[in-house]
Amino acid sequence: NKSIGSPVFFFFKIGTTQLVDVSQMVNLDELARVAKAYHLKISVVGAADSATGNDGINNPLSKSRADYITQQLMVRGIDKSMIISKSEGGIDEYSPITANRHTAVRLFVQ
């Protein structure tokens, strides 16, 4: 499968599945619109920051974040069969630390 464009990141408040800014949902609206129009698959990957939690906290939290975005895509008319959802647990890939509290969404040609 070939990824289209760059990932779109949705950032969360520490330890939660609450978005830092609900205006990020406009990005989700647009991703869903494009995915439906062109019959694209969607990859959803949840993450947490490893600096503020252990695996016991971060693994389920990153899954919950991915599940939240997946559910929001389904509310916007995306069939679950078109979504591939994964979680990474705690990561330290981005600076500042808060940038690791995210779910990344990518569109793919089938």
Set out the residue ranges of the language-model regions.
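A general structural motif
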Residues: 7, 37-41, 80
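A short, structure-level motif marking secondary-structure boundaries and short turns
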Residues: 3, 16-17, 53-56
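Periplasmic OmpA-like peptidoglycan-binding domain that tethers envelope proteins to the cell wall
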Residues: 22, 47-110
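Solvent-exposed loop and beta-edge segments used for protein-protein assembly and interaction
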Residues: 4, 36, 97-99
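Periplasmic peptidoglycan-binding/anchoring modules of Gram-negative envelope and division proteins
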Residues: 12-48, 70-75, 110
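Pro/Ala/Gly-rich low-complexity, hydrophilic intrinsically disordered segments
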Residues: 1-8
